[in-house]
Amino acid sequence: MSAATEPTKEKPVNNQDSDDEDEDIDQLIEDLQSHHGLDDESEDDEHVAAGSARPVPEELLQTDPSYGLTSDEVTKRRKKYGLNQMSEETENLFVKFLMFFIGPIQFVMEAAAILAAGLEDWVDFGVICGLLFLNAAVGFIQEYQAGSIVDELKKTLANSAVVIRDGNLVEVPSNEVVPGDILQLEDGVVIPADGRLVTEDCFIQIDQSAITGESLAVDKRFGDSTFSSSTVKRGEAFMIVTATGDSTFVGRAAALVNKAAAGSGHFTEVLNGIGTILLILVIVTLLLVWVASFYRTNKIVRILRYTLAITIVGVPVGLPAVVTTTMAVGAAYLAKKQAIVQKLSAIESLAGVEILCSDKTGTLTKNKLSLHEPYTVEGVDPDDLMLTACLAASRKKKGLDAIDKAFLKSLISYPRAKAALTKYKLLEFHPFDPVSKKVTAIVESPEGERIICVKGAPLFVLKTVEEEHPIPEDVRENYENKVAELASRGFRALGVARKRGEGHWEILGVMPCMDPPRDDTAQTVNEARHLGLRVKMLTGDAVGIAKETCRQLGLGTNIYNAERLGLGGGGDMPGSELADFVENADGFAEVFPQHKYNVVEILQQRGYLVAMTGDGVNDAPSLKKADTGIAVEGATDAARSAADIVFLAPGLSAIIDALKTSRQIFHRMYSYVVYRIALSLHLEIFLGLWIAILNRSLNIDLVVFIAIFADVATLAIAYDNAPYSPKPVKWNLRRLWGMSVILGIILAIGTWITLTTMFVPKGGIIQNFGSIDGVLFLQISLTENWLIFITRAAGPFWSSIPSWQLSGAVLIVDIIATMFCLFGWWSQNWNDIVTVVRVWIFSFGVFCVMGGAYYMMSESEAFDRFMNGKSRRDKPSGRSVEDFLMAMQRVSTQHEKEN
């Protein structure tokens, strides 16, 4: 905007004073080298999707920059496009709490509570209700603590804006900005809406870290897009608003987050699946019991007591509580390793992750620009090259960009250049010029010689030298070849030249810069490969930079431009080809937020469990969509809120450590679930047959105690010594059910033998003395408690020593069960010590049989083939379905654009 068209200011706008004194160069270098890069800015300019969910017609974006909109036009546009704020859906917390009482296991527990109340069995009623509320409370608290992502996104937005209305500069609340408004941008302004720069010949720098997580300010010129929640770091300009509210980039990110959060978690689906099958088995067993009871004309009260007993034992009432406790203990352990778990089910998901979609900056690299080996023209001293490059830099700490900081910090390797630098006096400094693409400084040497130092785009620096005198062909060719080589490898290269006194320009060389890989990343990537984890890089950097980083890290170099994916429409490839393309690629460069979301979605549709790392607002949708969303060190609040796990330690190694721990936790959960399903099947089979054949059942109070003891003892599984699998682990439900069924049958046979051999008329094992309820209670408790020692081991039960917590918990429960049997608590008659010893010996025999059976099933390939435990990817891929779904998505996208 020219001075002639400058609008009248109704309210002055404060400008920050940047005319501070030059700082001492020695102090500046020492300061930079002592901070270890904490203030370094990243070179990775993450791209942000332009456009909006609700496009504004171009004719509404032809506002006169000198006059702005009229008040009437503002009113019309606000009525059409609404306020400049994100829509918010409030959630009823009470309804959310009630949702934790819905599910197959919960339904059975609720039915059992109603039955217990009807039978006036208040002890059982209280125990069941207590378990129900405990499960719901733990789940609700975990979900509530995750926080509101939309609230975090809204925190990044501006509160007010300076706009041109009716030819005047006025300050208005940010939510009153409308499409077509002309906004004034200057140092420190937080941009309240998406827009486009309309000031000709402008040059401003904008901090988009609230969106991308990247700290390096982005250069913007006339016609470039700006985005809501970004901050102007340097320069002044005017912009026209192109999108507001939900149609801005931040608004669309919030919408994608809500979309991603709509589905139920993977672990919830697994538990519901197990609960559904157990519910069906309970119904089948109850039908058998009811038919037998009606045949014998049992009274309704007796039938209801049988029903209550089957209902209590048929479903593992403590399953949610034990699994939640196991994950909570694991989360506390991860917290010690600086990994904060915000969603407990993420631990289970992380254990099964096969593909990690990782950002580059800060995770794979140091997020710290550094100087690589400089290229010097023949005959030039490297110290002269370094000295000239550092002379062409600001002496103000606030004026230093990331490249200047990298050069100054590298002086530690060039002591002669560092010593000479302090002897030069800065006469003039001209910051980066977007037209000439170079930085210029005029200095005075200790001898009083005037020297012009320049650094900038290599070919522009070369042109500056050639304008004065020709360069030898071999020097020019070698220089250009080196620049081309560095560009192909993804380095950011700067040419350096100088002019001493009245002499000619001298081309000195090229300074290559790059964000280097972290020291431990290559080793960690190799370790990840051995753990069966594929790492795909998703970065906003250029393809060359991505490929060079992958080469240094030992990752695959099949890196493609994300344009081939398309934005929302999937590009031009058929759905099946697109899925193959994403599956086989090692990563994508120049990605937009929608690309990240699409990559995660496509891999999930192929049956993979996917983890995604991110640190910016633009990562929030894909973090929420992924099976495990990981917010890396330094992430924005919105990214942290969207993530399942937040890492406080930098680098990929922290993620790999957490993955190992999660696999240990998964092993504990898997062994418990096998154990607990076997227990439910055991009592369903035994009690169902006992009731149907002999019209008898255990005392209902003892049934409740058996259910409680089974879970109380195994709560300590959360502290057990567990190995981690060398490959991703998943819920192979067919194999799990096969093992549980066989173990349950062995347990039922053992209990049936106890029932039918210990109470024969003449000379039974217990010689017809004592209480059948007490004996059965002890035998069931012992064999069930000991089963956990079998399922927890990766090999034979003696191959792994359990933790003292688990051993102690089982021993305490066994002692209590023995006291029940000895003193006849809730079983009417006491039993002598000989009876108890015989039950212990017999139970150990059953334990050994179960141990042998479990080991054979674990090691048997034939059993695996029989159970056919395959993942979704082993099934026909359904390529025609993928093609159809992608075609429908493109039609939907095109329809949205047309409307």
From Swiss-Prot:
Domain of life the protein comes from: Eukaryota
GO CC list: plasma membrane
Alphabetic keyword roster: ATP-binding, Cell membrane, Hydrogen ion transport, Ion transport, Magnesium, Membrane, Metal-binding, Nucleotide-binding, Phosphoprotein, Translocase, Transmembrane, Transmembrane helix, Transport
Catalytic activity: ATP + H2O + H(+)(in) = ADP + phosphate + 2 H(+)(out)
Broadest EC class assigned to this enzyme: translocase
Biased composition (Acidic residues): 17-29
Record's subcellular location: Cell membrane
Protein task: The plasma membrane ATPase of plants and fungi is a hydrogen ion pump. The proton gradient it generates drives the active transport of nutrients by H(+)-symport. The resulting external acidification and/or internal alkinization may mediate growth responses.
PANTHER family tied to this protein: CALCIUM-TRANSPORTING ATPASE
UniProt-recorded name of the protein: Plasma membrane ATPase
Organism of origin: Kluyveromyces lactis (strain ATCC 8585 / CBS 2359 / DSM 70799 / NBRC 1267 / NRRL Y-1140 / WM37)
